[in-house]
Amino acid sequence: MKKGGFGSGGFGAFSSSTASLSYVAPPPDLSSVPQDVIVPFKNLLKRDSTTKSKALEEILACVKKSDQPVDDSVIDVWAQLYPRVAIDNNRRVRELSHNLLLELVKSAKKRIEKTLPKLVGPWVAGTFDKDKGVARAALAVSAHILDSDQKKAKFWIAFQGKLLEYSNEAIRETADSLSDERTTSKEDMEAKYYRVLGSSMAMIQHLLPTVKDDQYPDELKRFFDADTLWTLAASDDASVRRAFYQLVASYLDNKPSLLEPKLKDVGKVLVAEGPKKEQRGSAVDLLRALISVTKRFPKVWGSKSPLDRLRPLVQKGSQGGSDEFWTELDQLLAILPTSSPDYAANAPAFLKSMRTAITSREERRQNAASAWACYLNTVDRITAGSTPSPDFLQENLYPLTREYLHPSTETSTWAYAQPPHVFKAWKIVPYTTNEQVRSSAKEEWQKLGDDFAAGLSNSLPEVSPDYEKSQLELAAQGDRWFTLVQGFLRGAPSQQSFDGDADLPSVVASTSRKLLESAQDLLARRNYKPFCAAAVLKAAFTKAPVLCAKSDLIKKVFPLDDQEAFEKIVVSRSLPFLASCLGAVTPDQPDFSEQVWVKLIDAALSHGFPSGAPIVKELVSVPLPQTVAQKSEALQNFIVEAWQDFFKEEPSSPVVEQLCRASISHSVVDDKTLQSLASSFAQDIGVAGKYDPEFKALDLLLRNKSALFADAPVDLFTRLLSLEEISDSEKATKVAAIRSLIQKQYGGNKLWLEVIRLSLAEADPSSLDINTLIRHAKEILSSGVPLTDLLPSAKAWNTELYSFLRDNPDPSLSITSSFGGAYFLATESEGSTLTTQKRDRQGRSIPARMAIYTTNLFTDVDLESVQADLLELIFLTAVLANDDLTVMKENGLWSLPASEDIRTERSDEIQSFLDLGTSLLARVAGASASWKEGDLDGTSLAEMLIQSLLQQAVDFSAKALYASKALTELFQALVSVHGYPAGAKFDEWFNKLGIMKATPQTVFAAIAFLTGFDEGLASSRAVANLYNRLVSDIVGCFPSSPKTLYNVVLLNICLSVYPPAKTPVEQRKLVFALKQFTTWVQTPDEMTFGLTAEVCKGIHRILPNVAQVYGPYWREAIDYCLLLWEKARNDTPQRWPAYVLPSIRLISSMETLEDPNDDLVEALEETAVDRSKALIRLLELPHDVVNTARQILDETLCRAVQKIPLKHLTSEKDLLTNLYGLLSSGSREVQTAAFGLLHRALPAQQEEEVLETLLEEKVAKVPDELLSIIQAVPELEKYTDEELAGFPVDVRSYLLGWHLVFDAYNQAPLQVRKQYTDSLKADNSLNALLELMFDVLGHSTGQALNLDKNTFSAEHIRSYDVSQSEEGTKERDMQWLLVHLFYLSLKFLPGLVKSWYLDLRSKQTKIALDSWMAKYYAPLLISDALDEVNDWASSQEAPQEDEKELRVRVNRTAKEVSAGYEIDEDFASIAIKIPAGYPLESVEVIGENRVAVNEKKWQSWVRATQGVITFANGSITDGLAAFRRNIIGALKGHTECPICYAVVSADKKLPDKRCSTCNNLFHRLCLYKWFQNSNKNTCPLCRNPIDYLGSSTRRGGGGD
């Protein structure tokens, strides 16, 4: 929609009149309004503002959401309502009224034009609303309609008349006509009234500049003729007064002729009454109106003195306003008529009123400058026409100086004046034109001087408690005095001597000289202790040196012939002031000054350091002649000592710092001394205890004497960088500032290149972090520095790397690497020695630093600029680092200490480096486009690397091993990018290399190709030939032969190239090899551990090819494996994993072999138990080494252990006993295996033990081994949060132990469970578990684990799978186990949990636990309990002949169990209600229907049932069984009554009256009826008399 929407014809003339603002205006006709807004429009007629605002919101919403233009009837109705709604007292109603108008304008577009005359008045008036939100809403309408300057101009011309008409109507309204006094408070009535008047006046003021003189004169005159208007100056509303004054001023400025007829009213309101009225908030506007009226009509002031008329207003000051009041007042006073006879006579009173106002408590202090300026201007005007009398000056000017110099209560009405005001005041004094005034001024200054001198003389002694305060006050007064003197003398001629009293400056100078003499005399008399006098002298020498230049005052202050005076000066508080005096005269009197300096320094140095430091600091802080300072050897030594103290780590005193700064800024120390200091500081940076942590000394030297460090900026720069890295953030920021300063002064790139070179060549704890070097190297590289300038030396890198390649590789690497047994072949070079490696503080060695740095640089450059030798070193470093990481080598390229946090951090860094290396390798491979076709001309980067690495893989050294490993990585990268090479060219190249043979020179190279290309060489003839030769050569080898090991290693790697059972060798040859292997195992002592491991691998890999071959070697192989497992118990942890893992894999492959031969099956069966025992004994091996190899071994071993048959575990009790101990193993895998076995075996073992316990009537208890585990409660305090999140093994062992305890509960009967519970209760074991549980899960801190957020379902709560738990994080595993254990605790030990809960003191824990229980556990346990009841009810044993089945009904919705026992077609029934907090809250048993027993007996059954449930660990089924037993017991022996043929009588009782003759039992009630009917007291059966009934029965009582 286009804004405005009005035609080009603009705003025409309209005949419609404005709507009434009165509340009694007739309501609009709503009959034509649409139905959807008729109700809101009716609500607008109501009085309540809330109702109105809601109605407006509803109408607004309807207009906005409607797709159709608004109906004309709505616009018409709104035009009638808008004027009154727009002035409502509620700001929200007013704002919404304008918002609604805007939406109507948008919707109606041009159709609104005819209604605008009715709307324009309240709309424009709304733009002047005091509330900003309301005004903003009204202005939004203006912005929409008047969206161009042309439209604005037309609008104001077209609607001037309507706006004037609206204003005239508004000004004639009254508070009673605008509001209904019956329903509106007086305050609200006045607020609306003033709001209407204020906006109408503001609108008129806005219109006045646009109305031409001949336009609407009647309307404007009519507005000013309104009687109401002239009463508004006395309004209580400041905004109304302000609007009135602004309107009058606007009339005077724009239409003065219209106002002239009302001049009498104007004079009355503005001049006569205005100053007398309260003008807070409107005073400035009143003054502006007075200025306007005075300019146009000065006669308005009448004959009375204007000062007298203004005095009431002036006396009140700005009344909380700004300094504009005084500015406007000054302008008004400047144009006031002064012709009245009493003008001068009223001046003193007027000035007094001004002073009172200026210094009143209500006057803002920031107004003082403008106020005093106005005051002085006023005095100047008053005195301009005549010479003021001395009395006038004494009363109205002189006190200003007195108050400024020495504030007192007597002159408090002159406070807050500043020197410019004092100067101006004295300029008003006609000193040279009037003798009386001159005499008065001289007397005033002499009095001021005498008073000040007396104050100095009478200053308090040092012993006085107010000594400091009084001295400072006098010092400040002296400073103010000579500030004034400085101002007085500044404008005088330079040659003027200021002698005599010819002019005012001379009088001031003469007085000041006397004052200085008094101050000097006071110092001499009182041993220089009154430092206020010294301060006065300093003020004179620094601010008015012309007064001191030609006097001998300075010589009196420093008497050269009085050494004692100098001793007194240096120890006095006057020293800083006097030193400043000396500094001021030094340029004019150098010889005298030098003599004084020497004496002062000698006196100061006699006090030594640090006592003399404050004295020397003062002396060197003023311009001290260099010759004096640098010639004094004692002073030089003193300042050097100060610098050394300043540089110390312990904070120096501020005085020492100030002394050092002064010594630099004033060149007190010679360059030679500073050079020595700088060199010493540069060396000590970074040395603990020798450097200032604030670096103030270094910063000071660098900023002022940077040339001092020119010989060693690199060393200093490096030291600072190192400090920056290891310091806290605050200190690091300071170091960075110093470092940046050096970098800026000496050139960044040049410094950094040298720093990088030196930092890469060395490594120590102070070395720069490698990431810092990388970051800055990249910045330098981007600035255009060649890459070669930034790279490390390949020779140095190679040398440093070789020192790590002299160690034999860790044997366990044969487990983790595809190189397998190749690690057994690498032997330490002859003559090599282990050296302590240099490392940085992150444990990185020099080659590690170089590798990280270079790899990061190479990631951002083209491969064409990369050097092949550095690439080769990166890949060699990477394969070595990968192996170090695999075995967690403590002293490898990175130091990997035992600390878990440090090890994890450094492991992550190694992995990041390896990832970068892999990416770089992929780039190298990708750049070798000719590889796929086999076109290998040796020119590509990859081929150059292959040739270089092949040249190094020519022996059995560790370097050859890692060169071949790097070669393997390169081959794999090439295959990954390009696939396997094919074609004759590649075969020719491959064959030409001649490496597929088993010689010491070719073994590693062959392994590199076999592992690098893997199955890609399966079709190679050269590989097949090598395989056949190796199989043949094995047959002729002996264990002790040097070539045996590398032949077997190479054979095993060849076997890995081919799929199982598809090797290119005859089975016969493989059988011979198998025989040879089993022959070697007959002499185990001749075999090295490496050969042992490789033999097991060989048999394992040959096995699929010879599975159908019969022979003794199967049993021999198994026996050898068992032998190895036993041998491992006495071997080193570095060696035994290498052969144990392949032996386990060999046994596992035998067990899982498809269609094995009978010999193998027989061997496996015969050794089954031995293997089970041996496997479990392997679990007991120590876990001193934790690395990837050991983890692989543990996982493999645990998988094998899990397959142990249950019968082996139950039949061999020793095995189970050993497993309990393994639950506390340091290996998670071993713990898992032990738990898995115990989890399976424990229920079976417990079943047998429980049977024995019940038969032999022993007390059952939890196994002692389990009790010892759950009694070893872990101390959580020794773990950090991060360590605890890693689920420490001792915490895991403890929790798994508890899981096994509950496993024992699971299969045990009630009696045994109770005995278990008693044993746990005795040692308080469960409490410790619960405390640990809720500490870990967050309940103790009030932040319980959110099971929903952590995706723990009901299934997780009910069950725990140890193997599945290891798939997530360790922290989640711990949380899951704890969550499940709490469930088991509630299920099996609710009584103990409840006891712990009731004793719990922590309210926070209790609250967290309550909500947790109610949300997650209670519903599950209630469901379990109801399921258990259902199962019990459905599995009840068939009742005996005289018994009935207990009928049980479960109501899950009500959480209730009902049980009934049928007796004579009725049911004795109870209800068991389960609370929401079950099982921590007890169930409630209610007796629903009593049958067969009296109330007392019945209640005892109900209580007994509840007691059984409560004390049977919450078992509802036990309670039901007890209830059934009680009923059956009560009915036992009771037969039907022979009279009624029922067991239970009508009064719900059993037969209890026996005939002594026939022994039959009868109901009492039945006998009674029988007696009544038969009229006999005889037995119904035997007819013999029964005399057993009591009197009550005979009376028909029938009760007990």
Swiss-Prot record:
Record keywords, A-Z: Cytoplasm, Metal-binding, Nucleus, Repeat, Transferase, Ubl conjugation pathway, Zinc, Zinc-finger
Any single GO CC term annotated in Swiss-Prot or TrEMBL for this entry: nucleus
Subunit structure: Component of the ribosome quality control complex (RQC), composed of the E3 ubiquitin ligase RKR1/LTN1, RQC1 and RQC2, as well as CDC48 and its ubiquitin-binding cofactors associated with the 60S ribosomal subunits.
EC number: 2.3.2.27
Zn finger limits (RING-type): 1537-1583
Domain note: The VLRF1 domain mediates binding to the 60S ribosomal subunit.
UniProt GO MF annotations: ribosomal large subunit binding; ubiquitin protein ligase activity; zinc ion binding
SUPFAM superfamilies membership: ARM repeat, RING/U-box
A single BP term in Gene Ontology: ribosome-associated ubiquitin-dependent protein catabolic process
Protein name per Swiss-Prot or TrEMBL: E3 ubiquitin-protein ligase listerin
CDD domains xrefs: RING-CH-C4HC3_LTN1 (cd16491)
Key word Metal-binding present: yes
Pathway: Protein modification; protein ubiquitination
Swiss-Prot/TrEMBL HEAT repeat ranges: 31-65, 114-150, 161-202, 245-288, 291-344, 526-606, 853-904, 962-986, 1045-1083, 1289-1324, 1325-1369
Subcellular location: Nucleus; Cytoplasm, Cytosol
Protein family according to the UniProt entry: Belongs to the LTN1 family.
PROSITE patterns linked to this entry: ZF_RING_2
SMART domains associated with the record: FANCL_C (SM01197), RING (SM00184), RINGv (SM00744)
Native source organism of the sequence: Neurospora crassa (strain ATCC 24698 / 74-OR23-1A / CBS 708.71 / DSM 1257 / FGSC 987)
Protein's job: E3 ubiquitin-protein ligase component of the ribosome quality control complex (RQC), a ribosome-associated complex that mediates ubiquitination and extraction of incompletely synthesized nascent chains for proteasomal degradation. Mediates ubiquitination of proteins derived from mRNAs lacking stop codons (non-stop proteins) and other translation arrest products induced by poly-lysine sequences and tandem rare codons. Ubiquitination leads to CDC48 recruitment for extraction and degradation of the incomplete translation product. May indirectly play a role in chromatin function and transcription.
Reaction catalyzed: S-ubiquitinyl-[E2 ubiquitin-conjugating enzyme]-L-cysteine + [acceptor protein]-L-lysine = [E2 ubiquitin-conjugating enzyme]-L-cysteine + N(6)-ubiquitinyl-[acceptor protein]-L-lysine
